[in-house]
Amino acid sequence: VGGIAAMAAMVGLAIYMLIRNQILYKKKMKKEAMQEEVDSTISKLRETKDKREALSLFREHSRDELCDVLNFASDTFNRSVHGFMDENLRELRKVMSAIEEKKSYLKQVKRVGTLGVTQLEHDIAIDKGLYYYQGNDFASEIVFSIRRLTEPGKEHVDNHFSPLCEVQKEDFGKMTDEIVSFLNR
């Protein structure tokens, strides 16, 4: 009888370790993909000697990053609000984790922007660099704001406070849909 229980415990431990390793592997691969994207932009900016091409690459990089942040904001805001309305603590934790990943990614992107600004002509660098840093700060602020919205919702659900009534959910849902549609424009 003791041997069967020990074998069952070992099988359970093995299954747990396999699942845990798979989850950690996926996180690692996602992080490496984000780093690879940043590295490819850096290499393109370093390789170019033409100031106009550098400006074009810098604009493309800025546009892509800001669009990505707005799409991320739309998705995480929607997930955060619906996680709160549905009292889905797991979803709210996933949103918080995604926000932390995005914050670190935006820091890396800001460093790429610094490199990009150095590749531009001096007069253009002053003008475009200012807008780039301002855009990056706005993007960081959007992510920070969603975090500040998600934290109280997560705490509310985690502490098992009374849920929203249907009227509140309906009003909150309408407002959420308007904000998400605005971000997706």
What are these regions (language model features)?
Residues 1-185:
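Cytosolic, long alpha-helical scaffolding segments
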